[in-house]
């Protein structure tokens, strides 16, 4: 059976028994078609949704309904009040399936103020104080659930005893919404298709009918249609109505087969059109990667002896990175610059990788990129490439199009990757520096800077205590309970809460709403403590960042202060396992590495919102002309104009809330958030992007702050650009 979730559209009648007609009139054209469908839209569900929608948010309600099976076989049996409950079991001994002692029942009946202790004999009953989703979690088992409240969600509510035992407990009106004790759900006859209004997408072969129409305002979950559609889109559970009609009504219909509905087409046993196998644009989400086995070698010692080289495997390096930089197998390359640091191409390979291991083992290692060891590596040879494969970089680790924050410790070469990779595309700005937020930018913006204030407070402590704290942190067997380390942490945390958290909170729009933002931070606590609503990726790199810190002697407070700062930030971080930062770097920069091998020029698109001229004029702005002003919220590039023209006709469920200041500083929010998986895979996205007017020359005079909401649509840019690679 294929289950199809239908969110009622406008003019839907709950009393209309012809449910199929409300989906599409062609489904009722022949009796034999109707026989292939079963409908699951119980009346008790409507009552429960109406009741809970007044006390819960739509998101909470939707989350609770996800675990409910179709059909619901369980019942919620409402127990009478303690005295009437005991009286019922005394009157009908066969109902005492819990074997409650008769003495307990008689004592409860005789008591003027009976307690609820008599219910303790009923295992797993749901008390009135239980969470609202307790019932929904138990419904899947299919067994009856005993409850003591009329407010239940997820199963029909029935009386556990005859109605006379509820006198004085339930009013006549309340009894109308409760089934009698002898009621049982109607037998549900499975058919080829089951249409349901229960928005649960977790069952096998369950899909969401993607009807492009306004929702029924009386249905409590209609406001969640965009969110539910995004959920189905991410899970590839969308079912186009034309596909269903082709399966049951007219085989001659030609639905468009797309990745968004691939699982639904397979469940319907529809054959893929022959034209669907033809390439339609370059897929920028499929990134080729490879593991490279490298030999790292040291210089000869004073006696001319050469130590054996060390073979390391750098995992999941973009193939196009090596191709663009003309890195060849079997060639011996210098590993270090005159400064002692690794050469840029090796740093890029390490930063964009998933891990570095000793070849032939699973032992991960961290490389020292600065001159730290007595005999550092000075040469590298790429011996061979192995395990060539393709990874999907569209939907993770960053999930949304607006902003993501990567947390890395100090000394993690964040500026290296931001400065070096864009240099490969000097003909086009693949990122906008204004939308790259450095981890030290906030502290440096304070007067005096955060590091300077921290140094001033440490200077009030005993110098020997600071030396002991640094030694304890750098010691292989570091003792973090040392009183010196604890003292430094207390000073840091107090100062951070005092000056950094309020400052972080004040720049919320800059982090999350100025377009497509890549922010860096030292720890996720920096964002969480300021309640910044941004996705945070806890990153790690295969480089020993502490050794890199020790090589930076020109920073505030010298290396000692940098080591203390790094340790304090790391103690703030949550204990969640980190994700290789290379996965995010591959997601953001990897698609651009494939550009040099394109044979077609890239055509630029814009994701635009419209600002009505009259709204701006009402806020004091002087605008040239009456047409709406377009706001460019995001851009993208494609290789096939005809393919793009078909894709951009798709309606976007997200809407834009745009705020424009009198200084023309613009911020945009998406409601619901715009997931990356909803953007076609043939769209090449910039690493970062800043919201701006498409035609700023139409703004003759700025006015006051103004906000407006708008739909979103993709449009072709008037000045398409050709992207070429110049190399590093």
UniProtKB/Swiss-Prot annotation:
Pfam families: Reovirus_Mu2 (PF07781)
Compartments (UniProt record): Virion; Host cytoplasm, Host cytoskeleton
Domain of life: Viruses
GO MF annotations in UniProt: structural molecule activity
GO CC aspect terms: host cell cytoplasm; host cytoskeleton; viral outer capsid
Keywords: Capsid protein, Host cytoplasm, Host cytoskeleton, Outer capsid protein, Virion
Physiological role: Minor inner capsid component. Displays NTPase and RNA 5'-triphosphatase (RTPase) activities. May function as a cofactor of polymerase. Associates with microtubules and plays a role in the formation, structural organization and morphology of viral inclusions, where the assembly of cores and the replication of viral RNA occur.
Family the UniProt entry places it in: Belongs to the reoviridae microtubule-associated protein family.
Descriptive protein name: Microtubule-associated protein VP5
Originating species: Aquareovirus C (isolate Golden shiner/USA/GSRV/1977) (AQRV-C)
């Amino acid at each position: 059976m294929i289950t199809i979730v239908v969110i009622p559209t406008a003019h839907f009648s709950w009393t209309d028994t012809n449910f199929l007609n409300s989906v599409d009139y062609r489904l009722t054209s022949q009796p034999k078609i109707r026989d292939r469908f079963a409908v699951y839209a119980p009346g008790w569900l409507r009552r429960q949704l109406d009741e809970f929608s007044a006390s819960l948010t739509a998101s909470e309600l939707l989350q609770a309904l996800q675990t409910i099976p179709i059909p619901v076989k369980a019942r919620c049996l409402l127990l009478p009040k303690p005295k009437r409950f005991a009286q019922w079991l005394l009157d009908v001994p066969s109902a005492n399936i819990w074997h409650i002692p008769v003495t307990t029942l008689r004592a409860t009946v005789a008591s003027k103020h009976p307690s609820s202790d008599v219910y303790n004999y009923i295992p797993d009953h749901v008390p009135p104080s239980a969470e609202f989703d307790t019932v929904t979690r138990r419904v899947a088992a299919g067994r009856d659930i005993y409850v003591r409240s009329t407010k239940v969600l997820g199963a029909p509510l029935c009386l556990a005893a005859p109605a006379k035992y509820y006198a004085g407990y339930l009013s006549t009106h309340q009894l109308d919404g409760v089934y009698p004790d002898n009621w049982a759900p109607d037998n549900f006859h499975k058919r080829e298709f089951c249409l349901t209004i229960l928005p649960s997408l977790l069952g096998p072969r369950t899909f969401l009918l993607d009807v492009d129409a306004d929702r029924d305002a009386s249905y409590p979950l209609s406001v969640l249609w965009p969110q539910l559609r995004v959920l189905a889109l991410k899970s590839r559970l969308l079912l186009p109505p034309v596909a269903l009609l082709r399966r049951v009504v007219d085989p001659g219909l030609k639905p468009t087969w797309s990745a968004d509905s691939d699982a639904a087409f397979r469940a319907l046993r529809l054959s893929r059109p022959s034209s669907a196998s033809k390439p339609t644009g370059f897929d920028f989400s499929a990134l080729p990667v490879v593991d490279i086995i490298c030999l790292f070698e040291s210089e000869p010692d004073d006696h001319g002896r050469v130590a054996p080289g060390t073979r390391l495997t750098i995992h999941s390096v973009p193939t196009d990175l090596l191709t663009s930089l003309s890195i060849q197998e079997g060639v011996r390359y210098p590993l270090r610059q005159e400064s002692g640091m690794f050469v840029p191409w090796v740093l890029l390979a390490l930063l964009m990788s998933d891990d570095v291991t000793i070849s032939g083992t699973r032992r991960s290692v961290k490389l020292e990129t600065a001159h730290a060891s007595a005999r550092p590596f000075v040469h590298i040879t790429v011996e061979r490439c192995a395990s060539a494969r393709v990874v999907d970089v569209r939907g993770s680790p960053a999930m949304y199009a607006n902003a993501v924050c990567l947390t890395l410790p100090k000394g993690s070469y964040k500026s290296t990757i931001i400065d070096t990779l864009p240099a490969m595309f000097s003909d086009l700005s693949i990122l906008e520096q204004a939308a790259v937020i450095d981890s030290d930018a906030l502290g440096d913006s304070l007067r005096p800077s955060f590091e300077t204030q921290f140094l001033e407070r440490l200077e009030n402590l005993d110098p020997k205590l600071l030396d002991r704290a640094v030694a304890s942190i750098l010691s292989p067997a570091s003792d973090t309970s040392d009183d010196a380390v604890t003292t430094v942490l207390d000073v840091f945390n107090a100062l951070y809460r005092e000056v950094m958290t309020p400052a972080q909170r004040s720049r919320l729009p800059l982090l999350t709403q100025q377009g497509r933002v890549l922010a860096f931070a030292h720890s996720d606590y920096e964002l969480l403590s300021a309640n910044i609503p941004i996705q945070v990726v806890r990153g790690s790199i295969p480089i020993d960042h502490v050794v890199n810190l020790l090589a930076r002697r020109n920073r505030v407070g010298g290396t000692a202060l940098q080591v203390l700062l790094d340790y304090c930030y790391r103690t703030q971080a949550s204990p969640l396992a980190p994700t290789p930062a290379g996965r995010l770097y591959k997601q953001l920069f990897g698609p651009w590495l494939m550009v040099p091998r394109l044979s077609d020029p890239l055509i630029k698109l814009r994701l635009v919102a419209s600002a009505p001229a009259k709204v701006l004029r009402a806020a004091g702005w002087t605008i040239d002309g009456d047409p709406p002003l377009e706001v460019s919220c995001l851009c993208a590039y494609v290789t096939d104009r005809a393919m793009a023209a078909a894709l951009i006709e798709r309606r976007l469920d997200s809407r834009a809330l745009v705020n424009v200041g009198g200084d023309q500083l613009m911020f945009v929010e998406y409601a619901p958030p715009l997931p990356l998986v909803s953007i076609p895979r043939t769209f090449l996205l910039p690493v970062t992007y800043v919201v701006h007017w498409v035609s700023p020359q139409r703004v003759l005079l700025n006015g006051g702050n103004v906000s407006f909401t708008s739909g979103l649509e993709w449009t072709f840019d008037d000045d398409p650009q050709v992207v070429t690679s110049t190399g590093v």
